[in-house]
Amino acid sequence: AAVANNPAHPAARRLMLTGYNPADAQVAALPPCHVLAQWDVDHDRRALSCQVVQRSADVYLGLPYNVASYALLTHLLARVSGLVPGTLTHVIGNAHLYANHVDQAHELLRRRPMASPGLRISHVDSTGLVYRDLRWDGQRFGLTCALVPRSFLPLQPDHCALVDYLPHPALSGEVAV
């Protein structure tokens, strides 16, 4: 499923993205971890906020990427809609730290937080939107009206950059299965 309508629209509380497809439930190795995101516009502040519902979270390896990716997506959607980013609320059903990540987690807790970096987004603006309608294909039902900003179509990784990012040395960890 995809974003249902323009975030600048007055009824924008219906903006949702779902990672769960019942048709895939029997063939997927695992159900999706982050299953739902909903965006909401505060029209007084002209701000777009996001709430993410996550079924399961690997706190050390997965959660930081989940938070960063939904924050970036919210920034991008706000940009193409002429809004400012609002808040990100993240609800986790089952948060877990695997035994093989405990030492790295202790090291993270010992570290003093660095200043938050800025985010630079280029080549993304609010210059038009294209509607894409997903329909029944004979096997799967996906009737969702997706709003795809034209300016997203040529989006490349180098169009987004962290500014003044001063990280601690990297910590690694093996994926737990």
Language-model segments: residues:
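Terminal, non-catalytic protein-protein interaction segments that mediate quaternary/complex assembly
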Residues: A1-V177
